[in-house]
Every structure is written in C-alpha cells, then in structure tokens.
Amino acid sequence: MKNFILSNNEARLVVLQRIELISPFLKKLRKFFGRTLFTNFVTKYFLNSNQIGISYYAAMHKEFLTFQNSINSDQDQLFLSIGGGLGGLELIINQNLPSKKYYFIERNFISKKVKYGWGGTINNEAYNDLEIQKRFLENNGMHNSQINIFDYDKDKLPDQKFD
C-alpha cells in the first residue's frame, strides 16, 4: 500500500489536521477566502481524496522512518496516541508491526475556524470525528480488536502502562 483509502469526510479531516497536504491552488483559495470559509465550505466540496490519501501516506511513512529503529517489535505491544488525528501514523506502524493494540485519545468535534500551532495559548480547537476515525482505521487494514478510541472530553481515559 502506498496510499491511504480516504472518503471525502476523511480527506477533509486530514486537511484540517495537516494543511501542508493541500495543493498550491487550495492554499491560494484558503488565503483569499479565509480560514472560516475554507474550513466550512472548500474542505467539504473541493478536495481530491485520492491525492490527499497519497500525500498523507507519504508524510506518515516519512515520519515513521524517523523512529522505526526505536520500536522493539517483540516487546512493544501497546501504542498510545494523544491528539494524533485520524491515525495514519499508527496505520503505518501497524503495517510494519501487525497485531499490536492502539489507544487513541482524541477530541470529538470539528471547530468552525482552524487555528494552527501552540503559541503558548490554550488551544480548544479540534478537528476530528471519532466514528470517521474508526472507519478510516478499519478501511485501511487495522482490525477492530486493535482499536481503542477514547473521547478526551467524555470518556474515562486508559490507566495502564504503554510501550
């Protein structure tokens, strides 16, 4: 697999989480129309989900290569992802080290206006939908028994040691 299979809704969430994956034309549209219109209109109707799937896969694979040698394939069994988006990086890990368990802690809403960065301020923004995330993981090869998703604002968070 050299790309992720993305529905339009999944591609939208990927773009809201990783703006660098959009085309130069969409970057110009975003700059011209502003973040609110881009978030609520352009990302719903003008994304190429196939191209986003290719770009997202490449970005996650490149990231995986930076720490691949730090994972012990025999000992590391439980992976924790906090605010990791849809889980593309975890899918790459799963392709290379199958049969692990993944725990995702995410917020479950999509902000009206995208705000990127940290800048020392409290960031109450979120760009995820946990049902869409689960469907994305399953459609791209992660088995349901490997997936544990927690809503940061509503669920009791996991209390165990992670690898």
Model-derived features with residue positions:
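Class I SAM-dependent methyltransferase Rossmann-like catalytic core
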Residues: 2-74
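N-terminal cationic-hydrophobic initiation segments that often serve targeting/anchoring roles
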Residues: 71-72, 94, 102
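Conserved class I S-adenosyl-L-methionine
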Residues: 75-85, 103-106
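Conserved SAM-binding loop of SAM-dependent methyltransferases across substrates and taxa
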Residues: 86-99, 115-116
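Class I S-adenosyl-L-methionine-dependent methyltransferase module
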Residues: 101-142
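Conserved SAM-binding strand-loop segment of SAM-dependent methyltransferases
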Residues: 142-153
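A short acidic, Gly/Pro-enriched loop at the edge of an enzyme's catalytic core
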Residues: 152-163
